[in-house]
């Protein structure tokens, strides 16, 4: 889909701050509010804008720490559908946050969230590994997030260590 300059500008504004209201977007883009609304409605209808979401730092919420894992998956593609069929089966699991087709040693990269490492292990052994097309998996646990989707989680400004000088 070919976009106009203003449509692209509005997408860039929303990509940076999905909470921006119509008036703010109109001022930033230099167009009337009703035109912004028309453009956004069109982009939503065409599924260019898929969703608006918040980015949560779950480590700061008691009882919601959880575990995130990236799983590299080797699969045997099926004739006529390639990797799409197995990717769809994988992304339908509730635990799965993202699925990517990759170049390199592994075919798919799967990001999942669980309450514990045991939950992730059960997902891999009971659900993922048992799929017909899956040949092998390698699981990597996320130990700490520094930056995600362009947003920095920790700046290091609150370093509480004591300064030691000679």
UniProtKB/Swiss-Prot annotation:
GO molecular function, one term: sequence-specific DNA binding
Gene3D superfamilies reported in the protein's UniProt record: 3.30.70.920, Winged helix-like DNA-binding domain superfamily/Winged helix DNA-binding domain
The keyword Transcription regulation appears for this protein: yes
InterPro entries hit by this protein: AsnC-type_HTH_dom, Dimeric_a/b-barrel, HTH-Siroheme_Decarb, Tscrpt_reg_AsnC-like, Tscrpt_reg_AsnC/Lrp_C, WH-like_DNA-bd_sf, WH_DNA-bd_sf
Origin: domain of life: Bacteria
Residue ranges of every copy of the HTH asnC-type domain listed in the record: 3-65
DNA-binding region: 22-41
A Pfam family hit: AsnC_trans_reg
Keywords: DNA-binding, Transcription, Transcription regulation
Protein name (Swiss-Prot/TrEMBL): Uncharacterized HTH-type transcriptional regulator YugG
Species name: Bacillus subtilis (strain 168)
């Amino acid at each position: 889909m070919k976009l106009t300059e203003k449509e692209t500008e509005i997408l860039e504004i929303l990509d940076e701050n999905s909470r921006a209201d119509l008036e703010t977007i109109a001022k930033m883009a230099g167009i009337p509010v009703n035109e912004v609304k028309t453009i956004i409605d069109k982009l939503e209808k065409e599924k260019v804008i898929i969703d608006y979401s918040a980015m949560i730092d779950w480590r700061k919420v008691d009882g919601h720490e959880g575990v995130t894992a990236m799983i590299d998956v080797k699969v045997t593609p099926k004739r006529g559908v390639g990797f799409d069929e197995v990717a769809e089966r994988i992304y339908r699991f509730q635990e799965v946050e993202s699925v990517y087709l990759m170049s390199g040693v592994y075919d798919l990269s799967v990001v999942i969230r669980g309450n514990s490492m045991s939950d992730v292990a059960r997902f891999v052994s009971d659900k993922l590994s048992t799929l017909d097309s899956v040949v092998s998996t390698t699981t990597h646990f996320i130990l700490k997030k520094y930056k995600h989707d362009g947003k920095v989680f920790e700046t290091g400004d609150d370093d509480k260590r004591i300064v030691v000088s000679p």
